[in-house]
């Protein structure tokens, strides 16, 4: 909402320059500005807008899309403006959107949606939530790098040698790789890869120790850890990607956010529910939940539903169905601050 005394600053934020669409709601005057993306220039712009708004008793409304840098901008000007973060991915695309794209068009679209009262908003996590998510994402990045190194070593052995590739990542297997007779060049490259693997493991230990410290002070993570198949790392990771449960009006909203809601088509009296899975906002959350299904499906609370779903739809769809049930349980646990019940029917 806005008043006819306010000044709207609709922003297309970039690393070097920022496009501004300035709208004075009192006079109807609109102007376009382009300023360097620096702390001083942004403060100068806001102070100028604030002075004009104060003369008529209005406020400055800063509207920008959810992009890298929004957190530092909000910290810089949050006390001087009403800060609004737009979710442009949920905005409807105009017919020629794929042919015409510019900063001028982008700021115009965002401003138009805001004035119409239909601007979709993005969640603005606090500094603590952002730190926890970075911790989780750092671990995921290290795991992916570790997988890349292991795949390289496996591919090298498969391509150049006839050695047995089973059990390579045990202490015995790593000792075997270090003693493997190779040419001087290949020996050097393999040693580099093994050193990289060891460094990644040390970094993983540091990150997981930091996650353990967060876990020790987080009762919600400890409750989620009580679910069979979900350990400390997975509990922290799931909660970091969910964020405050108050974001979601219902369990179905959480399921949709994770990309596990069925597609839906309706026209007149015709309704059609499509495939489960896909879509959603947080693919990492979906991955974490699905990966835990190997053990979660055996919990008495879900076992009967899983067995029925396997007989009717197959194992993969059955796991998605149980993943939806798990998310409903997590929503209940976090929303009502209750512990997980392994027996009660979901």
Per-range role (PLM):
Residues 2-24, 110, 142:
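Gly/Thr-rich phosphate-binding beta-strand-loop-beta motif of the actin/hexokinase/Hsp70
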Residues 15-41:
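Short glycine-rich, Thr/Ser-proximal phosphate-binding strand/loop in the N-terminal lobe
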Residues 136-221:
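Glycine-rich, often acidic, oxyanion-interacting loops/wings at catalytic, nucleic-acid
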């Amino acid at each position: 909402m806005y008043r006819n005394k306010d000044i709207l600053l609709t922003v297309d934020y970039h690393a070097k320059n920022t496009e501004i669409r300035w709208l004075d709601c009192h006079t109807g005057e609109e102007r376009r500005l382009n300023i360097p993306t620096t702390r001083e220039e942004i403060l100068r712009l806001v102070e100028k807008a604030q002075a004009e708004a104060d003369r008529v008793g209005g406020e400055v409304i800063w509207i920008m899309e959810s992009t890298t840098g929004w957190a530092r901008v909000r910290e810089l000007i949050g006390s001087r403006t009403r800060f609004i973060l737009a979710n442009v991915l949920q905005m409807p695309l105009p017919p020629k959107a794929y042919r015409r794209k510019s900063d001028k068009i982008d700021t115009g679209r965002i401003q138009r949606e805001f004035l119409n009262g239909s601007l979709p908003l993005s969640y603005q996590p606090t500094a603590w939530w952002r730190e926890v998510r970075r911790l989780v994402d750092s671990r995921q990045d290290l795991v992916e790098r570790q997988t890349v190194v292991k795949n390289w070593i496996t591919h090298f052995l498969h391509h150049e040698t006839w050695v047995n590739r089973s059990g390579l990542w045990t202490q015995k297997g790593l000792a075997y790789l270090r003693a493997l007779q190779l040419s001087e060049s290949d020996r050097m490259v393999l040693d580099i890869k093994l050193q990289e693997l060891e460094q990644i493991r040390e970094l993983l230990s540091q990150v997981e120790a930091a996650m353990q410290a967060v876990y020790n002070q987080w009762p919600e993570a400890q409750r989620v850890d009580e679910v069979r198949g979900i350990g400390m790392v997975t509990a922290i990771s799931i909660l970091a990607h969910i964020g405050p449960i108050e974001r979601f009006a219902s369990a179905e909203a959480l399921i949709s956010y994770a990309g596990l809601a069925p597609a839906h088509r309706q026209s007149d009296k015709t309704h059609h529910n499509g495939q489960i899975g896909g879509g959603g906002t947080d693919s990492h959350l979906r991955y974490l939940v699905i990966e835990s299904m190997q053990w979660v499906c055996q919990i008495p609370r879900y076992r009967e539903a899983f067995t029925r779903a396997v007989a009717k739809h197959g194992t993969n769809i059955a796991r998605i169905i149980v993943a939806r049930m798990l998310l409903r349980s997590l929503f209940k646990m976090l929303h009502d601050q209750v512990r997980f019940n392994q027996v009660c029917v979901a």
